[in-house]
Design a protein with these regions (language model features):
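Class I SAM-dependent methyltransferase Rossmann-like catalytic core
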Residues: 2-41
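Conserved SAM-binding loop of SAM-dependent methyltransferases across substrates and taxa
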Residues: 47-62
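S-adenosyl-L-methionine
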Residues: 74-102
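A short SAM/SAH-binding and catalytic strip from SAM-dependent methyltransferases
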Residues: 105-125
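A short glycine-rich, Lys/Arg-flanked "PGG" loop and its adjoining helix->strand segment in the class I
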Residues: 122-134
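Conserved beta-strand signature within the Rossmann-like core of class I S-adenosyl-L-methionine
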Residues: 132-146
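Class I S-adenosyl-L-methionine
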Residues: 148-197
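Contiguous, well-folded functional domains in the mature portion of proteins
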Residues: 182, 197-418
Length: 418
């Protein structure tokens, strides 16, 4: 990415082509999910780029978008482009001639993929510090094609391990891109309640209301690949039909439907689809002192496996407890492998625990420590089924479900804050 108008080192992107619409949407997702007045800064903006288009589309009343031209554009071209979009947008977009003229922003987006050496990438990120408000997010892309990333990709992975609040692989881009979202200072937990659920490329749309998790797309692709190989190897045989017919059911296991989340601010929503196994008060020292209200939900192999965030908050911890793989409907499941996601919320500490089962052996969690999450937001999945527990401060919440109730993730209200 050429940052020729910036006070920190230039990083070349000569071998890299542009950012497509999907990658642009991921890069600007943190700006798009804010429902309160927000300032975004796009560095390396091209007047014809998908990144500028996505940032403009995300504008709400009260927002401010600051653009710094990249090597493929100029401030004058940006001004002409924004003016042509109408006064409503032009009034909310500010174009500066150099980065030095920009003010600190809540979301900073590098408009072109970052390449070069690790030292150059580190210098770019260090140079951005003066343009970040408290809790700001930096969104940056690096090519995900082997041999074309240099040291920048390794440095971004290192930075993501320390400060990452999200990472998306966008395969449908040329070249494929890895989007890193970094937060270098703690965010205000209260802001989580004002956010919309984050856009995740891992949720692949099939229709307007039905998505498939990327795990399902990969599994279906493998099945179809096996079918193609079988047909090529034995054209006269019908053996290829077995993996071909299996592709759709395999993808269906990973279905990820869109959900309407209740607007009641006191509502706590189900973290998964399934049947309520237990509603009880207990203690769990892993989550801290005090008593918790726990609602445990069993996911059968036929239920939607994607897990949702039950309440808005900030992820403060994530850890996995080793254990067995007992049937999730039995008491022995208490000692199964369990992944704890701990949230700081306006109502105290909340825990979401994904447990393995007899069949389910794989837990996926996509909300790193430091992430602000909205209620109903996708947070991961369990392959295939098993159990998800929600822990709430017992003195601040009342259950609204009983044992045997069927619940829908992100939609069903399982408890209400007092």
């Amino acid at each position: 990415m050429l940052l020729s108008m910036t006070p920190f080192p230039t990083v070349s992107t000569a071998p890299v082509t542009g950012v497509g619409p999907r990658a642009a949407r991921s890069l600007t997702a943190e700006f798009a999910r804010h429902n309160e007045a927000t300032t975004a800064l796009v560095i390396g903006a091209d007047h014809s780029s998908a990144v500028v288009a996505a940032a403009v589309e995300a504008l709400l009343p009260g927002d401010t978008l600051i653009l710094v031209a990249g090597e493929r554009s100029t401030a004058e071209l940006l001004r002409d482009h924004i003016t042509g979009l109408g006064s409503w947008i032009a009034d909310r977009v500010r174009i500066v001639d150099s980065l030095a003229e920009a003010e600190p922003a809540d979301v900073v987006v590098l408009g072109e993929p970052l390449t070069g050496t690790a030292e150059e990438a580190r210098a770019v990120l260090d140079g951005l510090s003066k343009y970040l408000t408290d809790g700001a997010v930096v969104s940056v892309a690096t090519p995900a094609t082997p041999g074309r990333t240099g040291g920048a990709a390794a440095e971004l992975f290192r930075q993501s391990a320390l400060f990452g609040v999200g990472s998306d692989l966008v395969v449908r881009n040329q070249p494929p891109l890895r989007i890193h979202k970094l937060r270098f200072s703690r965010a205000d937990t209260a802001k989580a309640a004002t956010l919309a659920p984050a856009y995740r490329p891992s949720s692949v749309p099939v229709t307007r209301s039905m998505h498939i998790d990327s795990n399902g797309v990969a599994a279906a692709g493998i099945a179809l690949g096996l079918a193609a190989l079988a047909r090529s190897a034995r054209p006269a045989s019908k053996l290829w039909l077995l993996p071909a017919l299996a592709a759709a059911p395999v993808a269906a296991f990973f279905r990820d439907p869109e959900r309407d989340t209740p607007t009641d601010p006191r509502a706590v929503v189900a973290a998964s689809d399934g049947k309520v196994l237990s509603v009880e008060r207990l203690t769990d020292e892993r989550l801290g002192e005090g008593e918790f209200l726990r609602v445990a939900v069993f996911l059968s192999v036929l239920d939607v496996h994607v897990n949702r965030v039950p309440v808005a908050g900030r992820v403060t911890d994530y850890f996995v407890i080793d254990g067995g793989y007992a049937n999730a409907m039995t008491a022995a499941a208490e000692h199964n492998v369990a992944a704890y996601t701990v949230l700081d919320t306006d109502h105290g500490t909340v825990g979401v625990v994904q447990r393995t089962g007899l069949i389910a052996r794989r837990i996926v969690q996509r909300t790193p420590v430091g992430t602000l999450v909205a209620r109903g937001e996708r947070m991961g999945l369990i392959r295939f089924g098993s159990r998800t527990d929600v822990y709430l401060p017992a003195d601040r919440a009342d259950a609204t479900v009983t044992v045997g109730d069927r619940v829908i993730g992100a939609s069903s209200v399982i408890a209400r804050w007092r």
